[in-house]
């Protein structure tokens, strides 16, 4: 049975901001700024791997994003700080008569490491979701970033027949552009089923990591089983980019996690320890 969508006819728009900053103090990473306005919060503050890696679980208590809403994240890491940011569940973008927006600004100083590992975004039919991410790396800062998007509700048989999804991603190192991407997917567009588009897969995922790996590890990553279509490329400028198309978000998530398990020791020098929230 398909669950009814919430009635958002009289939904008051939420304008939420979350500003986070981290600094290295001795052998530990400490949060030095944690400011919020509106319904964006840090739910938990953890050191599951010891003091060097600060893990924060970010939550949006309303549980969904509707027309007129805006969410803004600003994340800054000082030299040699290490933060891992994730979420407890999927972000839901509801159908709406006007756009809802999310912006993410990331600034990493030399030697800093950020793992941005949220769970998926579900963009319901009729939603107007617009996301913009800008990342600035300084010196030898390290990044491990992913995002997953489910268009419609595949598990309920709901296609993305109306609305739109727009996403932009810019990554720079010392102001030099390393990666620029802008995509727009309109509900009902032929590209949803075209072999040069999503080929009928309603879930798309992207992983971007800074650094270079040897040919053997690259082949091991490419050999990982994927319940969909997945591949990984080493790009000039020291970026690894992985793509996945899948029929369900859990399949894309499983593939990204396995990639992270393989790549984290090579790129970040630590074994992969999955956040416990992923298992709840």
From Swiss-Prot:
Transmembrane segments: none annotated. Keywords: Chaperone, Cytoplasm, Nickel insertion. Its main location: cytoplasm. GO terms for molecular function: nickel cation binding. InterPro entries: UreD. Pfam families: UreD. Required for maturation of urease via the functional incorporation of the urease nickel metallocenter. This is Urease accessory protein UreD. The gene is ureD.
